[in-house]
Amino acid sequence: MAHINCTQATEFILVGLTDHQELKMPLFVLFLSIYLFTVVGNLGLILLIRADTSLNTPMYFFLSNLAFVDFCYSSVITPKMLGNFLYKQNVISFDACATQLGCFLTFMVSESLLLASMAYDRYVAICNPLLYMVVMTPGICIQLVAVPYSYSFLMALFHTILTFRLSYCHSNIVNHFYCDDMPLLRLTCSDTRFKQLWILACAGITFICSVLIVFVSYMFIIFAILRMSSAEGRRKAFSTCSSHMLAVTIFYGTLIFMYLQPSSSHSLDADKMASVFYTVIIPMLNPLIYSLRNKDVKDALKKVIINRNHAFIFLKLRK
């Protein structure tokens, strides 16, 4: 990798979503509202799953981990983006930029692999219901979560080290609202061919493998549903999988648009809009997708609300 003698950047300036001052405050209010909804939705879902014993199953174990990743995923990006709306020049240090990129990649890859683990869980539940609790033991569930976290951390660490070993001397102005690969690579004066091949290989292998696991799992699930004689059984099986199918389609579709396209066709403005969708909107949507379309979660939420109301009435009567 060729290096050019130059003054290395010690900080970066994030351009943000817009240069129009009149849009910044409305966008700040909008994204702050979305972020608060994301935090409440995902943390609330985790607490609900932990509090209700009827939700202590492998399916909801994976869902609570997905909610945790969504919360972290959004929290890595959104607070800094909100600051960009309030300050004229949003400066981020070299080390903070590296940390943000590393954390972002860790949680993005974790989400992709967790969705694949959840697809396997759905496959076992629909295709082998009698063996479900035998196959999906606590040990297997922990492995299906630990492997994505471990792989994601190691891949993100290596990826971040490669990115920040490059020389940044052309400019320190990042045309994005967070530290991401494509905008950073446009600033470097180093040879980026190896880095771009690494991005393509990692994104391709990781996401294609994840998509294949999901695709194969759902092919077996669809065949199993079609073989069911009971219409009620087919409806229940489909309702079990529909939320996950929707979440998978939204997440992978956005990532394919972002990363699995030639670098020459990348438009940073289009990338910004796609990035908003999968770093801000998807973490907000997932709790809604999995809650509003899930009878067990809705019943557990009603139970919590009723119990709290009863406790409140009891305390009022004691007074």
Curated annotation (Swiss-Prot):
From the Swiss-Prot or TrEMBL record, state where the protein is found.
Cell membrane
List residues in topological domain: Cytoplasmic.
50-56, 119-122, 226-239, 293-319
Q: According to its record, what are the GO cellular component terms?
A: plasma membrane
Keywords linked to the UniProt accession = Cell membrane, Disulfide bond, G-protein coupled receptor, Glycoprotein, Membrane, Olfaction, Receptor, Sensory transduction, Transducer, Transmembrane, Transmembrane helix
GO MF terms here are: G protein-coupled receptor activity; olfactory receptor activity
Q: Can you tell me which residues are glycosylated? A: 5
Residues in the Extracellular compartment per record: 1-28, 78-97, 144-204, 261-271
Name the cystine pairs: 97-179
SUPFAM superfamilies per record:
Family A G protein-coupled receptor-like
Q: Known Pfam families for this protein? A: 7tm_4 (PF13853)
Q: Provide the membrane topology annotation.
A: Multi-pass membrane protein
Q: Report TM segments.
A: 29-49, 57-77, 98-118, 123-143, 205-225, 240-260, 272-292
What the protein does comes down to: Odorant receptor.
Q: Which family does it belong to?
A: Belongs to the G-protein coupled receptor 1 family.
**Mind telling me what this protein is named?**
Olfactory receptor 8U8
Q: Which organism is it from?
A: Homo sapiens (Human)
What is this protein's gene name? Answer: OR8U8
